Amino acid sequence: MTSTPLLDTIQIPADLRELDRKQLPQLARELRDFLVDSVSQTGGHFASNLGSIELTIALHYVYNTPDDRLVWDVGHQTYPHKILTGRRDRMHTMRQKGGLAGFPKRDESEYDTFGVGHSSTSIGAALGMAVAARQTGSDRRVVAIIGDGAMTAGQAFEALNNAGDSDTDLLVILNDNDMSISPNVGALNHYFTRLMSGRFYATMKSGTNRVLGMAPPLQKLAHKAEEQVKGLLTPATLFEEFGFNYLGPVDGHDLGVLVNTLQNIRQLKGPQFLHVVTKKGHGYKLAEKDPISYHGVSKFSPENGLVSKSGSSKPGYTQVFGDWLCDMAAQDERLVGITPAMREGSGMVRFEKEYPDRYFDVGIAEQHAVTFAAGMACDGLKPVVAIYSTFLQRAYDQLIHDVALQNLPVVFAIDRAGLVGADGPTHAGAFDLSYLRCIPNMVVMAPSDENECRQLLYTAFLHDGPTAVRYPRGTGPGCEPVAAMTALPLGQGTLRRQGKGIAILAFGSMVHPALAAADQLDASVADMRFVKPLDTALIRQLAASHELLVTVEENVVMGGTGSAVLETLAAAGITVPVLNLGLPDHYVEHGDPALLLADCGLDTAGIVRSVRQRLDAGSGTA
């Protein structure tokens, strides 16, 4: 472990504020060294944290935290904040079961003023806190720290519009590193890039001086014209139109400039906007060169960096989707792919390279992504929206109003369904089966293995209406996808094991744990495949020939597939004991996915235990 004598003296930000300003650069170096050592041993978000170190130090140095409120957007960049706020000795537990969360969490520290994990919430939350301070007569200051990637979301601009029209003492800091996870997209990003490149100004100034150098009056007039044009192009034009006092851009790695600027801003009244320019991965050469790969990392050697993983014999579900997307695009030129800023995470890198004109990254704009797809579907295209389960929640109205109500053929490829592990409850796909199956016209599918995933994606693409295929993070049971694509019968499951007495109706990722449990219980197992429409004939058949039905899903029990089975039985007037197994009615925290599933009783041992407890209880009620 690197020696960190100055950092060792900092337990809370009050200790930091006792330092001489001249000591802050040394603290930044030690904090960066500690961060590299820490994350290399635990894994986690990395490049964004390296880029936020100086800004974090300056904020805690100038502001009286925790009384003054720092509201972080997304939370990827808050490891330095956690280290400086009393959690340094727990950094070795980062994102592990029972350890520190990878994002700000209100019940973890009083310095974490707002829980977060999704993008673009900081300005709205900070405005609410600023209004609360005004209403209660408090003189506390409130700061929102938001990245340029998060500024592509409409929610951020809704909050800016509201905040700029208020008289609250709010500071919004734009941490501009020209990259959130994947490179940023859209007009706003091009606007920032054009401004920061300096080419326009450099060309204009050098050309003016060269051409008009011998004519001072004309040169002076040209400089006036330059200032007029510059005024039209600077970010101040945009943000001051929202009602903010714009300051910047400033170097986000110059502690002297940051501290001076923040001290001055802290004395100002009304909404302020500070544009800070940082470099993702700053101070660690490998991360500076490849910030995408170093955004989220597993354990690595600080000296050697990330090591390429050897090819796995089992392709992950994300890769299965990406391969299917390219294969399907080769067959049907109507296919277009849409992602809300998750090219790598959703498996669309190959598709972008092979079909750049049919690939659309709309930025962190889930609502727009869904309506954009609906418009494409209206006029003959076949859009596939690749999106995480947790982020589809942000576009629920568009899903209902713009797609399903009009019965448009949009395919939703829903990644990260179920528990996701280290990222915790903000990123878990715990609710999609419940919130999708209640929507008219929706067809909802849950594959049990890699090949079934490929075939159900094909089935979805052929369907003339809205469809969703949900699959978990990581690898499946190892069923090699078959190259040939075959549409599966809509709304039909398949009986995978014939037993007696007990029938397990398993959905998606729970099929293989159910099969293993059935070996111990001598139970029948149905791979239901479809959540909507359900295979009602198979349900009735199993109900008639078994004494207990067990539903198993990696989704909350409330409103999920178990509820759907009970509704089917009730509608048919069939009375049979039913045991519903799924995620509990509370948020499942971060940790190793296998351990979390075991805690929820959704591993093989848990299924066996629950069934035997039900049989021992001898209950005849659902």
From Swiss-Prot:
<comment type="subunit">
    <text>Homodimer.</text>
</comment>
<dbReference type="InterPro" id="IPR005477">
    <property type="entry name" value="Dxylulose-5-P_synthase"/>
</dbReference>
<dbReference type="InterPro" id="IPR005475">
    <property type="entry name" value="Transketolase-like_Pyr-bd"/>
</dbReference>
<feature type="binding site">
    <location>
        <position position="366"/>
    </location>
    <ligand>
        <name>thiamine diphosphate</name>
    </ligand>
</feature>
<feature type="binding site">
    <location>
        <position position="284"/>
    </location>
    <ligand>
        <name>thiamine diphosphate</name>
    </ligand>
</feature>
<dbReference type="GO" id="GO:0019288">
    <property type="term" value="P:isopentenyl diphosphate biosynthetic process, methylerythritol 4-phosphate pathway"/>
</dbReference>
<dbReference type="GO" id="GO:0009228">
    <property type="term" value="P:thiamine biosynthetic process"/>
</dbReference>
<dbReference type="GO" id="GO:0008661">
    <property type="term" value="F:1-deoxy-D-xylulose-5-phosphate synthase activity"/>
</dbReference>
<dbReference type="Pfam" id="PF13292">
    <property type="entry name" value="DXP_synthase_N"/>
</dbReference>
<dbReference type="InterPro" id="IPR033248">
    <property type="entry name" value="Transketolase_C"/>
</dbReference>
<dbReference type="Pfam" id="PF02779">
    <property type="entry name" value="Transket_pyr"/>
</dbReference>
<keyword id="KW-0479">Metal-binding</keyword>
<keyword id="KW-0784">Thiamine biosynthesis</keyword>
<keyword id="KW-0786">Thiamine pyrophosphate</keyword>
<dbReference type="InterPro" id="IPR029061">
    <property type="entry name" value="THDP-binding"/>
</dbReference>
<feature type="binding site">
    <location>
        <position position="76"/>
    </location>
    <ligand>
        <name>thiamine diphosphate</name>
    </ligand>
</feature>
<comment type="similarity">
    <text>Belongs to the transketolase family. DXPS subfamily.</text>
</comment>
<dbReference type="GO" id="GO:0005829">
    <property type="term" value="C:cytosol"/>
</dbReference>
<keyword id="KW-0460">Magnesium</keyword>
<feature type="binding site">
    <location>
        <position position="177"/>
    </location>
    <ligand>
        <name>Mg(2+)</name>
    </ligand>
</feature>
<dbReference type="GO" id="GO:0016114">
    <property type="term" value="P:terpenoid biosynthetic process"/>
</dbReference>
<dbReference type="InterPro" id="IPR020826">
    <property type="entry name" value="Transketolase_BS"/>
</dbReference>
<keyword id="KW-0808">Transferase</keyword>
<dbReference type="GO" id="GO:0052865">
    <property type="term" value="P:1-deoxy-D-xylulose 5-phosphate biosynthetic process"/>
</dbReference>
<dbReference type="InterPro" id="IPR009014">
    <property type="entry name" value="Transketo_C/PFOR_II"/>
</dbReference>
<dbReference type="InterPro" id="IPR049557">
    <property type="entry name" value="Transketolase_CS"/>
</dbReference>
<keyword id="KW-0414">Isoprene biosynthesis</keyword>
<comment type="function">
    <text>Catalyzes the acyloin condensation reaction between C atoms 2 and 3 of pyruvate and glyceraldehyde 3-phosphate to yield 1-deoxy-D-xylulose-5-phosphate (DXP).</text>
</comment>
<feature type="binding site">
    <location>
        <begin position="117"/>
        <end position="119"/>
    </location>
    <ligand>
        <name>thiamine diphosphate</name>
    </ligand>
</feature>
<dbReference type="GO" id="GO:0030976">
    <property type="term" value="F:thiamine pyrophosphate binding"/>
</dbReference>
<feature type="binding site">
    <location>
        <position position="148"/>
    </location>
    <ligand>
        <name>Mg(2+)</name>
    </ligand>
</feature>
<dbReference type="GO" id="GO:0000287">
    <property type="term" value="F:magnesium ion binding"/>
</dbReference>
<dbReference type="Pfam" id="PF02780">
    <property type="entry name" value="Transketolase_C"/>
</dbReference>
<protein>
    <recommendedName>
        <fullName>1-deoxy-D-xylulose-5-phosphate synthase</fullName>
        <ecNumber>2.2.1.7</ecNumber>
    </recommendedName>
</protein>
<comment type="pathway">
    <text>Metabolic intermediate biosynthesis; 1-deoxy-D-xylulose 5-phosphate biosynthesis; 1-deoxy-D-xylulose 5-phosphate from D-glyceraldehyde 3-phosphate and pyruvate: step 1/1.</text>
</comment>
<feature type="binding site">
    <location>
        <position position="177"/>
    </location>
    <ligand>
        <name>thiamine diphosphate</name>
    </ligand>
</feature>
<feature type="binding site">
    <location>
        <begin position="149"/>
        <end position="150"/>
    </location>
    <ligand>
        <name>thiamine diphosphate</name>
    </ligand>
</feature>
